[in-house]
Amino acid sequence: MIDKTAIINSKAKLEKNVQVGPYCVIGPNVEIGENTIIQSHVNISGNVKIGKGNKIYPFVSINDPQDLKYAGEPTNLIIGDNNKIREYVTINPGTVGGGGKTVIGDKCLFMISSHIAHDCQVGSNVIIANNVPLGGHAIIEDNVVIGGNSAVQQFTRIGKMAMIGGMTGVLHDVIPYGLSTGNRNSLQGLNLIGLRRAKFENKDILGLSLSLIHI
């Protein structure tokens, strides 16, 4: 269902069962996969490809990179399947200098007012809590959790299944499976809760713990 107040460019491509709510604006080079729901007041422009089964909440803005060097070049944003993008989230396509592409995987949750900057690479099953900005070129691997009001510096890499505590300033890379907290983040150990939730065996957790000693 397409609301009568939505403005959708005739060149946009919407697959079957896409829903677009009131007062949305969708540009000409946008592709939206089937069964995706776009609620009210959402703006999507640029070369954007959105997969299947996503849910995009009110006042989300997907628009040009926030980079002074960006001069309107055709760059890309690719979003996978079954993601939840909550209110006031902002997502930017890539820049020419950063490879020209921002990529988001599948089954992620982006909570209210989080920001995915240009050229970020976000894996699958990632949870980014409220008010978390990712700086440009950040790499967030699969199954990462980032606590609320944290900030991730540009060019930072967070390894798979790592957890970032709330209100953490991430200035350095974080190892896979690590737990990092602090105003200037420091490694506190393994993300034991996440490992147990993922049903890692005790012997594997022990092996990771022993490896951590040598870092």
What are these regions (language model features)?
Residues I175, G182-I205:
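ABC transporter nucleotide-binding domain
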Residues I213-I215:
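Conserved small/polar residues in nucleotide/adenosyl-binding loops
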Residues I2-S186:
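Structural signal for interior beta-strand "rungs" in well-ordered beta-sheet cores
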